[in-house]
């Protein structure tokens, strides 16, 4: 089960730097199941990879997603400019994910389908809540965490694409420097800094929970 943790900015660690540390420490790249999927050496690697693509699409393949909702609710300024670019870039990632989901074949038969769908619905609702949050900084925290945490996810998608002969698009998400700039520029109060941290933590929590679910489904299929 995913555990919610907190990283607090210090005089030596800015709000933006704390966000990057948060993603590095709590993000998908450190999850054992993602590491195993990228390694791809197990006897059921292809099936597990297919399952991961399908569940990622269930979480992030719908429109509008977190980025678009956050952009719609954001006022003018630095955060809106960044979200506009991030939203356009993530839409390309979403379309890639949808196309790849069709290419990898059907969702692997796995016990506990109803429980899986309930977990995914809860995760989608959580992301929508973050994107719609009225707390200044919360949606931006979730959006910047999503962009930063997408890179290990993108490596997973590209591995699946290589298996089925699908050409991946060139990555176009905002880089780390732009994340630092927008977080530093948009969090001018302690309240907005706390809200940004909360949004980031909750996004990463949902990603870890997704890989927990994928790991449990892989184990269930092994006994099926």
What are these regions (language model features)?
Residues 2, 190-224:
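Acidic, carboxylate-rich catalytic segments that either coordinate divalent cations
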Residues 22-29, 36-74, 129-133, 137-154, ...:
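Alpha-helical bundle segments that constitute or directly flank the non-heme di-iron/ferroxidase center
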